Amino acid sequence: MSHTIRDKQKLKARASKIQGQVVALKKMLDEPHECAAVLQQIAAIRGAVNGLMREVIKGHLTEHIVHQSDEVKREDDLEVILKVLDSYIK
């Protein structure tokens, strides 16, 4: 079973939290708010996205790299995660 399926409820809860934070940010932008409050909300969204990414990466590394017995498959999976990290960190 895929780690994203096994952890689906936890990951969906994180995604829902992010969605709520984005909705709150959009409301903040429609009304006058202090810049600091807007920046804090953006930082909170970024932190939540980073947390979601961390959980999915941890699951991927554990299931597809650490516990992968097929060396070719492990190398392929590692390459995939490295490409994703490159695009995420840009």
UniProtKB/Swiss-Prot annotation:
Keywords: Cytoplasm, DNA-binding, Repressor, Transcription, Transcription regulation. Pfam families: Trns_repr_metal. This is Transcriptional repressor RcnR. It is found in: Cytoplasm. Belongs to the FrmR/RcnR family. It comes from Citrobacter koseri (strain ATCC BAA-895 / CDC 4225-83 / SGSC4696). InterPro entries: Metal_Tscrpt_repr, Metal_Tscrpt_repr_sf. One of its GO terms (molecular function) is DNA binding. Repressor of rcnA expression. Acts by binding specifically to the rcnA promoter in the absence of nickel and cobalt. In the presence of one of these metals, it has a weaker affinity for rcnA promoter. One of its GO terms (biological process) is negative regulation of DNA-templated transcription. It comes from the Bacteria.
